[in-house]
Design a protein with these regions (language model features):
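Non-catalytic accessory segments flanking enzyme active sites
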Residues: 65-142, 343, 352-355, 359-374
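Glycine-rich "HGGG/HGxG" loop immediately N-terminal to the catalytic nucleophile
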Residues: 109-111, 174, 187-201, 235
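Short beta-strand element of the alpha/beta-hydrolase
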Residues: 143-151
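The serine-hydrolase catalytic nucleophile loop
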Residues: 152-164
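Conserved hydrolase catalytic core segment
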Residues: 165, 169-171, 220-269
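Conserved alpha/beta-hydrolase
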Residues: 166-192
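Conserved acidic catalytic loop of the alpha/beta-hydrolase fold
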Residues: 204-222
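C-terminal subdomain of alpha/beta-hydrolase-fold enzymes, centered on the catalytic histidine
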Residues: 290, 298-452
């Protein structure tokens, strides 16, 4: 427990962290009276005297939880095979059985647990809930503070491979002046953060909490980035424009114009006069909403109902998440081309062990908006610089024409040739290069010293 005297937590600089080989690193420099919090503890019940403290965090799940998981996996009651030769009915039986066979026999959760525990992880209480986060400081004195937000069915694991390139660019083909300090929180209800006990934790509220987090860490100025829900939250922060937020970067932008959204919602043909890129975006989104959006409808309307099965069956949870890995990676429906089995199972197992199937789905219920539509996301209200990278495997490829209309303060737009919805996870080096380029103009703004 922490003493009554507020103590400062110091994260080791990135120079001492061999991320490239994901080795176990040196211990954190922490006050002797601080004890690490484990994942087994109730992160919704921090003592009152820790209301604004920043506490070290370590993951440790009881071995009984892992034994229970393996027993459930091995006892799966499998259904019959799909009646089509493709993925049009969902995850194919043979694909899921191959993944689950590995999960139940050879997969080792302890590897990723050790990898995460080698990172400087912390927890702090904001707006009544504990927020867990990774915080890695660069050894470069003028590093730009960068807040990164994950989405669903992702987690902080999406960004582990980017920490080295972002914080220590000279070892990864970059320049010293491209360095970032990196802050990667788990959203409320996700991973190792606390689970909301009341309604109201929508993207706007999360955005406010993230600004509190960055200010609590001592950053006067910073930038924010995200994909999936992370994009929605970055947009929300852009609208809020808290003091010190210099700009945002999103890789799932909300660009669909009102007239196009109306036609799509009505099931009408594409409006006349669309360019080739605009028509391709319209067709991609029409296919998504007509054939692939069932997961979202369930979580928007009945997160509790769908969650019972996901909380009780690890294979049900795996299928629910693997379906999105197959559809949203730049892999042609074969996610193992973009992510390893271990990477996918690390994420699935994190959701299972943290019991976050329902709590993560509740964010959809809280935000029943179309996250692709510019009007729903009120992107025109964003007054700070906005950067956008379009990845070819994203749910839709935002056209430059729509993006400029949606974001009047668009400062950077780039279409890349690989990567999908899980951009940082699939292409960590490319993702890093995009953030370097997107935020480089903001480093020299007069009167905005970046680091504390």
């Amino acid at each position: 427990m922490q003493t009554t005297k507020q103590m400062e937590l110091i994260a080791a600089p990135a120079k001492s962290w061999p991320f490239a080989k994901h080795a176990v690193i040196t211990s954190l420099i922490l006050a002797a009276s601080l004890m690490p919090m484990t994942a087994a503890e109730d992160s919704n019940s921090a003592p009152a005297n820790q209301a604004s403290s920043i506490r070290p965090f370590q993951i440790h799940f009881p071995e009984a939880d892992l034994v229970d998981l393996r027993n459930r996996v091995l006892a799966t009651r499998w259904p019959e095979k799909e009646t089509v030769p493709d993925q049009s009915q969902g995850v194919q039986l043979a694909k899921l059985q191959a993944l689950v066979r590995y999960w139940g026999t050879d997969y080792d959760w302890h590897k990723v647990e050790t990898e995460l525990n080698a990172l400087p992880m912390f927890v702090t209480r904001i707006d009544g809930i504990d927020i867990q986060f990774i915080h890695v400081k660069s050894r470069q004195p003028n590093a730009m503070p960068l807040l990164i937000t994950h989405g669903w069915p992702g987690s902080i694991l999406e960004f582990v491979k980017t920490i080295g390139p972002l914080t220590d660019p000279t070892n990864y083909g970059g320049r010293a002046e491209d360095a970032f300090d990196v802050v990667i929180p788990s959203m409320p209800g996700y991973g190792f953060s606390g689970k909301p006990q009341t309604t109201g934790w929508n993207p706007d509220r999360i955005g406010h909490a993230w600004d509190v987090l960055m200010k609590r860490l001592g950053y006067k100025n910073y930038v924010a980035q995200g994909g999936d829900w992370g994009s929605v939250i970055a947009d929300a922060m852009g609208r809020q424009a808290p003091a010190g937020l210099l700009g945002i970067h999103v890789n799932m932008p909300a660009t669909v114009p009102t007239e196009v959204a109306k036609a799509m919602n009505a099931g009408d043909p594409a409006p006349a006069g669309l360019s080739v890129q605009e028509r391709a975006a319209y067709d991609s989104l029409s296919t998504f909403f007509n054939k692939n959006a069932g997961y979202g409808i369930m979580m928007v309307t009945r997160p509790q109902t769908v969650g019972y099965g996901l909380m009780d069956s690890p294979v049900g949870l795996a299928a629910w998440m693997y379906d999105k890995f197959a559809q949203w990676t730049y892999s042609g429906g074969d996610p193992e081309r973009s992510l390893t089995k271990d990477e996918m199972l690390d994420d699935i197992t994190l959701y299972w062990l943290s019991k976050s199937a329902i709590s993560s789905a509740q964010l959809y219920w809280e935000n029943n908006n179309n996250n692709f539509n510019a009007a729903d996301q009120k992107t025109a209200d964003i007054k700070i610089p906005v950067a956008v990278t379009v990845f070819p495997g994203e749910i839709y490829q935002a056209p430059r024409s729509w993006t400029g209309r949606a974001y009047p303060t668009l400062s950077y737009f780039h279409e890349v040739n690989k990567g999908g919805h899980f951009a940082a996870w699939e292409e960590p080096q490319l993702y890093t290069e995009e953030l370097r380029a997107a935020f480089r103009p903001l480093r020299g703004i007069p009167g905005t010293a970046l680091n504390q």
